[in-house]
């Protein structure tokens, strides 16, 4: 318990220093702040209320500006990994790699669709990668329209959003970042190609 609470402050107060801090009187309030700063998520798939991406500090922003000096190399490395994935995964039955009409793509993500012809469903493939300590993401899962704060809206009815729910059940994003070791990229490809 912070000694300043005895001064009759409100429910929370902030401290101003590099990165800042929010001080709360109890674990429940802290937990709510943690949810709010992380898009409302309590775990990988559960959202309890609307939130924001409130995780960037000034130091992170400064590092981001420094990284802009190397953006061409970063994008080239991402594109190289994306090309490798595409080259080796387009022939795997039941895996669909997205294509883009853009002449140049930043390769910020590499989503694939796990289709009916593949021996595993998306969640089983995700679990397989997790067991191998390879971080993949089930992006757009669960759909935002399934969150409690939106699910009662008429526009959130799953019957009216077949593409949303289909994509949410099939998309998995593969790791793609500068410095990703080639052997990990190869393991990702081998894992997908040899799954049964």
Positions of PLM-derived features:
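Single conserved hydrophobic/aromatic residue that forms the stacking wall/gate
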Residues: 1-13
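PLP-dependent aminotransferase class I/II
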Residues: 25-196
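Glycine-rich phosphate-binding loop of ATP-grasp-fold ATP-dependent ligases
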Residues: 17-22
């Amino acid at each position: 318990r912070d000694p300043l609470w005895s001064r009759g402050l409100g429910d929370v107060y902030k401290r101003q220093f590099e990165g800042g801090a929010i001080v709360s009187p109890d674990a429940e309030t802290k937990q709510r702040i943690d949810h709010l700063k992380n898009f409302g998520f309590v775990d990988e798939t559960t959202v309890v209320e609307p939130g924001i991406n409130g995780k960037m500090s000034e130091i992170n922003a400064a590092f981001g500006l420094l990284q802009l000096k190397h953006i061409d190399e970063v994008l080239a490395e991402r594109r190289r990994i994306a090309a490798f994935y595409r080259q080796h995964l387009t022939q795997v039955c039941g895996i669909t790699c997205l294509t883009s009409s853009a002449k140049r793509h930043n390769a910020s993500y590499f989503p694939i669709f796990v289709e009916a012809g593949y021996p595993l469903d998306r969640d089983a493939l995700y679990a397989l990668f997790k067991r191998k300590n390879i971080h993949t993401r089930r992006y757009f899962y669960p759909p935002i329209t399934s969150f409690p704060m939106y699910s009662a809206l008429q526009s959130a009815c799953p019957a009216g959003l077949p593409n949303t729910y289909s994509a949410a059940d099939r998309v998995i994003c593969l790791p793609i970042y500068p410095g990703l070791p080639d052997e990990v990229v190869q393991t990702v490809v081998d894992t997908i190609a040899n799954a049964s």
